[in-house]
Amino acid sequence: GCAYALARAGKTDLLLLDRADDVGEVTTSQGAGLCGQVRDAAERIKLAMHSVAVFRELQRSEVKPDWHEVGSVRIALSDRRAEEFRKLKQAADDAGLEADFIDRTEAKRRWPLMDFTQAASVLWCPSDGWMTPRHVAKSYEHACRKMGVRVATSTGVEEIRVKNGRVTEVKTNRGVVECKYVINAAGAHAYHIAKLAGLQLPIVPVRHEYYITLPMTGLSPDLPCFRIPEMTLYGRVRDGGLLLGGWEPKSLHLDPRSYGLNGTPTPVEADWQVLDSFEESFSQLFPAATGAEKGFVGKGWPTFTPDGRFIIGESCRVKGFVMAGGCNAHGISGSGGIGKLLVESLLERRPSAYVKSLSPDRFTETSWTWDEARVQAARVYETYYGV
């Protein structure tokens, strides 16, 4: 997404490095693929809206991201949550995003198999949707190559060379590359890449899981995505089955120092106690979920920051070293918007206050500790749907 945005802005002298044998085959392939735009602040909504615009654009290309603009329903089960929805609706209005309240009858028409009798409020966003994350990566890659961007897979970064406070070269397992800028969009390894440049940044991997059932009667691919904040659940239809995920109230998180640049985070084993709890909760609204045979389990370590904001932009401590990380589980769905913010941070003479607030320089080495960062980042995850 970053390379695509830069290339669209005319900066095509880019070399995209991926340690894996193919772009998007590791962490990206585990994503759930939902893209929601309703947020609590206009800046965040506009970021998500730009991502949707990019997915629409890519869907018209030869290699498609498998974008399905099916809309979404956000379901409140209490008056308190319904009040939050009213604030979200106002934020959407302020940002120019279409989002409307619908009654239970209309909600039932859009999602016939779901029971809306408990719903205190339902917020409908027609331009939300879902994509296939691996296809998104391949679509970006194809578009980038067409614009002249070079892509090198099976290429791992070993060293970032800095001279007089500025990035000059990157040493890889396949040779040395001279460069003026390094953009760090390395996900769970973003901490390690930053460390190579001499920066310590609090980028904390937190476990996340979802499951997909085998095909179920009545689930069609045009059904809307759904979010049920009080149950901390989200979902959609995938391959004729139910994709159901959630945000755990007691998260499992890692210290990125526990694995090296050439290593991998501890493999995530399916936690059936957690996954079954998702099923138990959702069965209150969708009884057919009870006992549905589970097939694929998606799992991984998306990275979170202590303040819940992305880390985007060039560091004043190491000129030419640019961050695009700590995406708080929105690296795929927000990729188009993140690319836009990155371009603004690098190419605009006066970036917006919002973009400036995402700077890596907000984390100085004396402003945080790892113990605090892990607790705070985990809290961001655990209160994702907090009121």
Q: Where in the sequence are the language-model features?
A:
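Short Gly/Ser/Thr- and Asp/Glu-enriched loop/turn motifs at secondary-structure junctions
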Residues: 30, 68-72, 206-207, 296-297
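Active-site lid/adjacent beta-loop-alpha segment flanking the redox-cofactor pocket in flavoenzymes
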Residues: 215-320
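Glycine-rich FAD pyrophosphate-binding loop
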Residues: 7-29
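Gly/Ala-rich phosphate-binding loop of Rossmann-like dinucleotide-binding domains
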Residues: 3, 7-8, 143
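Central helical "cap/lid" subdomain
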Residues: 24, 176-224
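Flavin (FAD/FMN) cofactor-binding and adjacent substrate-gating region
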Residues: 54-57, 77-147, 152-153, 159-166, ...
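Dinucleotide-binding Rossmann-like beta1-alpha1 core, especially the glycine-rich loop
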Residues: 32-110, 232-235, 273
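C-terminal catalytic lobe of FAD-dependent flavoproteins
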Residues: 133, 269, 276-387
